[in-house]
Amino acid sequence: MCIRDSSKDLCMIEHIPELVDAGIDSFKIEGRMKTALYVATVARTYRKAIDDYLKDPVLYEKNMPWYLDQISNCTYRQFTTGFFYGKPDSEAQIYDSNTYVKEYTYLGIVGGSNAEGLYRIEQRNKFSVGETIEIMKPNGDNIKAKVLRIVNEEGGEQESAPHPKQVLYIDLGVPMEQYDILRRKEDA
C-alpha cells in the first residue's frame, strides 16, 4: 500500500478578487518537477481569470467553471488555499493513498516548422499516426486534430513516436505555432 504525507496543490483561481484587492500583481507556480503542460495550463488559466476579472467581475464569475475545468485537467493532486486564510488544518495534507490525478498526457511542445510545412516537436510521451490529440494554444481555444504524419530527423516516416525527447516533424492538418503544447485526453 502506498501512503502519502504531502501537501495538496495550492489553487487560488476562485479567489482572484481577493488577490487583486490585496495588491498582488505577480504569481509564481510552485513545485519542482512540474511538466511544461502543467505550467502552460496553469499560467494560461490564471492569466485569463485575472484579465476577465479586471475587465468585468461578472465575466470572471461566469467563466469560473472553465477555469476550474482547465486547472483540473492538468496533472494535479487535491487543492488547498494554503496559508491565505490562516494556518491550514489537517485537510491541507494528504495522508491516505495516492490521490494523484492525470486527465491529460503531455505529448510535446511545438518548436517551429520546416520548409515542407511539418511542425518540429520535442516529443515527451508516445503517440501514433491516426490518433486524435489536442493543441493547447498559449492564447485562444484548444484545437483537436488527428496525427496525419510523423517524420524523424533523418526524413524517415514513423507510425508512432515512442521515444521521449525525440525530435520529430508532424502534420496535424491544422496550423500550429511555436510553443503550442500537444496533449492527449486519457480515458477515465
Give the ranges of each region predicted by the language model.
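Surface-exposed amphipathic alpha-helical tracts and adjacent flexible/coil segments at the periphery
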Residues: R4-A188
